[in-house]
Amino acid sequence: FQNEDFEVGSLLTAIAGQNGTQKSTLLGIITQTFTLKTEDSMRVEKPLCGGSYISAFKDKFRLSPTFDKPKGHEWTISFDAGMDDFTVESIKRTGDPNVRFWKKGARQEGDGYISFPTIFLSLKRLVPVAEEAKIITDDTLLTQEELNEFKQLHNKILIAQTPISSATTITSKNKQSIGVSTELYDWNQNSMGQDNLGKIILALFSFKRLHDKYPRQYKGGILAIDEMDATMYPASQVELLKVLRKYASKLNLQILFTTHSMSLLKAMDDLVPVSYTHL
């Protein structure tokens, strides 16, 4: 990108385009700007979906030793009110990769990023459970209230009729998600769409926990989802979008995602007048 400007939505932002047009890179450069600093009380918390509220460089970027050089990258994020523009540049570091992204002109520890909880859901979430060598399960991660809400959201979004008897948190080398069991099948037989949805719902619940536990410190958050529509039925993609908008409004989230789905893009377009009415 050279001299490009774009605006993100107050609640939802969809990024679409041909393959190889740096959609995931856009997600990366936005979320890379944010972290939770050492002195932030929310830093000790861990998301239900695994990882942390500090989106990892390795989940977003694989730099080229040929084309990615120090001082070869720069971008600026502007805010609606109360904050100055924040410019990030690439600087040299020892190790591999030999480039890191940091606030332009700043070198002190803690100056490099803005403190704001962020979750980045990469395509690693789509690794099939069947391909994981070791899995740890836990039936106690969610509260009863969260479990009831999860069951309702799962069946609403997937347009499913079979009652869920239990939900099990699944942790492996590559991801942490949640699977469902019914009288007809258990979590071992869940589809990839169910697995993908479970991870996204856990991310939403994670922000809700921050919102409820830290009412004074929590000001909102950022959720980025790469290829959100992957593995999901088109009608379920639309139902998911409605749920995301509801949670974004309730929890002051900015949710950004990449997609190739025409159904999802049409649904986003239909939401625009609704959003203006909401504002």
Indicate where each model-derived feature is located.
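Conserved small/polar residues in nucleotide/adenosyl-binding loops
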Residues: 277-278
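Conserved H-loop
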Residues: 262-266
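H-loop/switch region of ABC-family ATPase nucleotide-binding domains
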Residues: 258-260
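P-loop NTPase switch/coupling surface
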Residues: 1-129, 139-146
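Loop/turn-to-beta-strand initiation segments
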Residues: 252-254
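Extended helical coiled-coil dimerization/tether regions that scaffold
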Residues: 119-218
